[in-house]
Amino acid sequence: MTNPKEKTPMCLVNELARFNRIQPQYKLLDERGPAHSKLFTVQLTLGEQTWQAESTSIKKAQHAAASLALSETTLPKPAARQTKNHMNNNPEAAELHGNTFTSSRHSAKGSITPTVELNGLAMRRGEPAIYRSLDPKPLPNQRANYNYRGMYHQRYLCPMLKTFYVQLTVGNSEFYGEGKTRQAARHNAALKALHALRNEPIPERSSLNGEANRGPEEDKDANKSEISLVFEISLKRNLSLSFEVIKESGPPHMKSFVTRVTVGEFTAEGEGNSKKLAKRRAAAAVLQELRKLPPLPVIEKPRIYIKRRPKNIIKASPEYGQGMNPISRLAQIQQAKKEKEPEYVLLSERGIQRRREFVMQVKVGEETATGTGPNKKTAKRNAAEAMLLQLGYKASSPVVEKTGKRGENPDWDEQNSGIADQTSTPKGILHLSPDVYQEMEASRNKTVPAPAISYLSSKEMNQASSSFFSTSVSQSCTAAIARELLTNGTSPTAEAIGFTGKNLMCHSSTVQPSKQLEYLAGIQGLQVNYSDRQSGNDFLTCLTLSPVQMTFHGIGSSLEASHDQAALSALKQFSEQGLDSVDGSLMAENGPFEQAKLRGEKADNKQANSGTIAQDCKDSKAVV
């Protein structure tokens, strides 16, 4: 349908059905073809007649069937409605139009008056339509008719109808209209303007904006508007620039603006149906004058060297740039354990604007550690370093205070000279360091089971205390003593070795784990330190064994219970150090429940064979 007001075939079929008092019926008969190109077959029934049509959609098939029904039906059709020949139901307007507007145009255009149509055409052309009323023509002088009897008798002198005249201006063209009313005169003038301007081409915007006939040297400014070019020229030549709307006229729906632009000594005006268009035309007019000015001399400006302010952020020690990054190392350790990677959380920011201090927290399983630094990166690094120490690993790199410039401290230079530069790796890829790789291989060969309740794995225990155990009682003896203390409360192995220390004497039936740990520490020559703090109704204990720098944690409702839990974790850690590879592999295959069961059986068997273990421990001590 070219005209949206034209009725569709289905609408005409409905009118035909209402006229004959029947009900039309559409039925979908078939649907075939692929999903992207289906064909639908629709059947239309009107009374006893049927028609079929197919198309690519159901609606199109219905319209096709309705078109067939309209052309082939034998039912009587209703009479067509007559179209209105009067515009806006105004007989005067229809009389003014004469034969210009046919009935078909009325049906297509509806109630569009000539003035409205002319306003649309004028807006497309960018020219305002301005109406101005004119004074009527003077009437001829008529003398009164007096009869011979001396009496005034008026014959056939009825008052003449008044005629209105209107002047219409569209751009540079003027048109005149007349009518019995002022509105009829406006319509008459608009009709004349439509006849004259309808076939004329619409002027191009390039000629309106003053963009035609540009030279090749202006091609570089093709994407810039005239207003931008005027601003650039005024800035380069140090000229004052101002835009001012000096006139505003016309009706509210078709206003006309006049804008004046002043650039130094040059002035120009522009007119348009919007302030933007008037401003652009004024800029285009003054731009023609500015381009006639002589070119500016080329002046090479000297380069300005800006001295950068020194950074007031104190950098961390250069030792942190060497060796293994603690963040990467902690991530590698968690990957080797096949556990969840560390989680970093920013807790707080302290300090003034230029002396910030960030507090970062890292969480590995149930362990947490914090680190501070002047920036988030350093705080994250310190938190990872603290977590490594808390897990029982050595520090990634020693923190050395920088006391002077490079070259002033020979010890610092010699220490850094032996460290190779760290190679850059792609983001997201962590290569295993040699020490972590060796630990993984050693743990695979030994197949030592992980502790059930502890903060240090057996692999970490080997790394932290291997040097100490090599000069004291062997690891198997230490594990045997710890198992005996956990099982019986006393250690026949320690007595067989000949340890003359503090005896485990307690009036109660059981010995506290803290006392047992002190007894074992006396055998090993370790120092036990407790660090306590209270959180609500619970007590938190941090147990440290030196000089091996092992840390265990405990929590309890009382200070004594918290100490006992931390000591119990340490004893369990020591008790799992001496298991042989066969038992370890068996435990790894059976799982946690079987490990606990096997551990109880081993404890009973080890008690019976304490004499043999004691003899082995004596031999190992003698060798040392």
UniProtKB/Swiss-Prot annotation:
Region feature (Disordered): 197-223, 401-428, 592-624
InterPro entries xrefs: DRBM-containing_protein, dsRBD_dom, STAU2_DSRM_1, STAU2_DSRM_2, STAU2_DSRM_3, STAU2_DSRM_4, Staufen_C
Domain spans labelled DRBM: 55-122, 142-228, 254-321, 354-422, 540-604
Gene Ontology CC entries for this record: microtubule
UniProt keyword terms in alphabetical order: Microtubule, Repeat, RNA-binding, Transport
Keyword field contains Transport: yes
Xref: PROSITE patterns: DS_RBD
Single GO MF descriptor: RNA binding
Xref: SUPFAM superfamilies: dsRNA-binding domain-like
Biased composition (Basic and acidic residues): 214-223, 596-605
Coiled-coil boundaries: none
Domain of life: Eukaryota
Residue stretches of biased makeup (Polar residues): 415-426
Pfam families referenced in this protein's UniProt entry, alphabetically: dsrm (PF00035), Staufen_C (PF16482)
The UniProt record lists the keyword Repeat: yes
UniProt remark on domains: The DRBM 3 domain appears to be the major RNA-binding determinant.
Function (record text): RNA-binding protein required for the microtubule-dependent transport of RNAs within polarized cell types.
Name of the protein in question: Double-stranded RNA-binding protein Staufen homolog 2
